Amino acid sequence: MSVGFIGAGQLACALARGFTAAGILSAHKIIASSPEMDLPTVSALRKMGVNLTRSNKETVRHSDVLFLAVKPHIIPFILDEIGADVQARHIVVSCAAGVTISSVEKKLMAFQPAPKVIRCMTNTPVLVREGATVYATGTHALVEDGQLLEQLMSSVGFCTEVEEDLIDAVTGLSGSGPAYAFMALDALADGGVKMGLPRRLAVRLGAQALLGAAKMLLDSEQHPGQLKDNVCSPGGATIHALHFLESGGFRSLLINAVEASCIRTRELQSMADQEKISPAALKKTLLDRVKLESPTVTTLTPTSSGKLLTRSPVPGGKKD
């Protein structure tokens, strides 16, 4: 099995690192495409030994499981570009927020009668094999296809199948959740520094507190409210701190954050359905539609041993 990523950004980098660290895939079995080869994430993928190309079509040809790891509004243009190269063997996995299975299937069915499509939502902690992933299978995807994706994603954290109409809410909760946690941790560390702690120690203590709390919750069957109560002594420091958080609307802010992320996810789907995208974004993403300033394109070609090597064709294209 080989895995391809259309897009070589943070998500592709995190998944590739997670898959290789888990031992479920070797780096030479992974390929990623990006129109820009000087990105930090591309450099990280290169150091891992992942195959890299500027051609999205090349990525499709050399993969069995294909992750669409680009911005939601770019998905329709990607599908138009690679549709003719998608074959019956491919499992097309959309990781883009808000992009529905039906919209991907509709595009691909112009080229292939029964495309196997899976929609998933994951998060960046897959990098350290502590991700949270849900997925929903499309009309033509087999049970075995879903099981294969679950095997992949379970190697980098928690993974479960859900109904598709729940995925937007998942995006607002666990998809965006790490950012909420990082912001909270940054603020906690600031509080520690304000009260005299060195920054490095404050960050470490805050991170360990969040990590420990999460592990306690996952390892127990207790409600988070009960675990919270267990920390609060009558008249103690913690209950006074919680009162301060409550008076500032702490719970409501988190609820509203999840809701805002979910609503924005649905707006992104609307943009994707209308195929709205700026010319600049299109130029950055689609190599085959918009010529890059440099006519040299790095592609991958199989050798007689089955390995993939990079090659650069002789420049011959004209600039627009």
Swiss-Prot record:
Q: Where is the PTM Phosphoserine found along the chain?
A: S304
**What Pfam families does the database record attribute to this sequence?**
F420_oxidored, P5CR_dimer
Record's subcellular location: Cytoplasm; Mitochondrion
**Could you tell me the EC number(s) of this protein?**
1.5.1.2
Q: Which Gene Ontology MF annotations are present?
A: pyrroline-5-carboxylate reductase activity
Instruction: Quote the NCBIfam families the UniProt record gives.
Output: proC (TIGR00112)
What interactions and quaternary structure are annotated?
Answer: Homodecamer; composed of 5 homodimers. Interacts with LTO1.
The protein's name is Pyrroline-5-carboxylate reductase 2
> What gene is behind this protein?
PYCR2
